[in-house]
Amino acid sequence: MENINWSDLSFGYMKTDYNVRCYYRDGKWGELEVSSSEIINIHMAATCLHYGQESFEGLKAFKGRDGKIRVFRMDENGKRMQSSSRGIKMAELPVEKFEEAIRKVVKLNERFVPPYESGAALYIRPLMIGLGAQVGVKPALEYMFMVFVTPVGPYFKGGFKPSKVCIMRDYDRAAPQGTGTIKVGGNYAATLVAVSYTHLTLPTIRL
């Protein structure tokens, strides 16, 4: 990718060639589908929009000195996504299908994997959303699992250098006995006020 400065990438979104999708309907998961579209169509009453039926994961692919592409312990991410699904009553995706989707999307976007020792990586974002239309708090009957990728630089530009930390005592990321042990979007939405405040004061890690 001659137009990408691999050593100066931010941790943000960059369009790549393909994403992979899979739908849960009639009590079972379908086959993996490949799409080049960045857009998804969902019903206005989908449970992901109203009742928070959404989970996601994050992992990276790296290119080694030998030119091979490696992803570290993707099965553990698949298991954690299953745990998130159980936590908010979504359909569980088999770990084998999760791994198949990861391998497929990385292969399809191989040209976006940064070179060895560039300091960058191919970030992999699996996510699942409730698609079924519901008015009333109940689980959806249909779900979509998808994976997209984007090349990224380090999350913290300072790398392993010491970072200032801001502890916010006025906000909770997740309630006790709630969803704090699973990876769902609501946990992160609850931090946005605190994050906005600390961005006004100093570059920090928010706890």
Model-predicted segments: where are they?
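Conserved small/polar residues in nucleotide/adenosyl-binding loops
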Residues: 198-204
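Conserved alpha/beta cores of soluble small-molecule-handling proteins
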Residues: 1-197
